[in-house]
Amino acid sequence: MKLRTQMLLVTLLAVALVIGGLYIGANYYLLSGTEEIEQNSIIETDNQFLKLLEYDLHHLSILTTDWGYWDDTYIFMDDFNQEYIDSNLVDSTFYDGGLNVILYFFPNGTYAYGKAYDLMADTEVPVPASLLEDIQIRKLIGSGSLLRKSTGLINTDEGPMAIAAVPILTSDEYGPMRGSLVMGYYLGDAHIQKLSEYMPSPVEIYSLEDSAAFAGIPQDTLKSYNDQVWIATEGIDTIHSVFVIDDIFEEKAFYGRTSMDRDIYRLGLT
């Protein structure tokens, strides 16, 4: 073989190796880029749910404040008149407001009156004693809590619940305070499904003690981000995210979980 031919072949081989290296490198960075995009996308989905939940809690706070800062409620805490009950604590109030409980407490935190409603069965039910105990033990109402509003999530025997607690004042926001008003609803499957209608993928909620939050997620691909978000991939088809949800005391209390199709990643493979 002539020297010129050998040099040409060597040159072509070198060019091929360079092109191949560039292709492999470009493909690597492209896949890395698509992985980052899909991770950011699912984290944004998590944040979107948290914002929707925050908006939901804000609406609950407004509703509870409207009732708590109201002359009729203020008078009711003095005489517990039947007219107030018949006019306000009716089934339609719970159904239209999406509420499971409306509870009244004396200034010292003692339970005074309340009603509970099963939205799925569309009927009144007894107020869970465990819920009253949770509210009182956590000091969401009573002395020291009456001067402020509290809105957020608590974990109950019946599951996660969104609650708002406000002092009971006159319509002009004068006292003396006659107790606390608490309104709340369970974050059950139906309510979560309703929130998920505004999101690209559904969300599930678990307590911190529930191992089901990570069930079926490949542990070998699971990565933690500041102990607030965990992301894992399942082949080229699915990406999962588990994220922390704080309670009313701004402490870790629940896990949220989302799963999305890896269409962005598969696009990078083509």
Segments (PLM) and residue ranges:
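A short beta-strand signature within small-molecule sensing/ligand-binding domains used
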Residues: 147-151, 158-170, 226-230, 234-244, ...
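Membrane-interface helix-start motif
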Residues: 255-270
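Extracellular/periplasmic ligand-binding regions of membrane signal-transduction receptors
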Residues: 40-87, 107-110, 115-126, 196-215
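Short hydrophobic beta-strand segments that form the core of ligand-binding sensory/regulatory domains
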Residues: 180-184, 244, 253-257
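Alpha-helical transmembrane signal-anchor/signal-peptide segments
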Residues: 31-43
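Extreme N-terminal signal-anchor transmembrane helix of membrane signaling/transducer proteins, especially
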Residues: 1-32
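Extracytoplasmic/periplasmic ligand-binding sensor regions of membrane-associated signaling proteins
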Residues: 58, 70, 75, 93-180
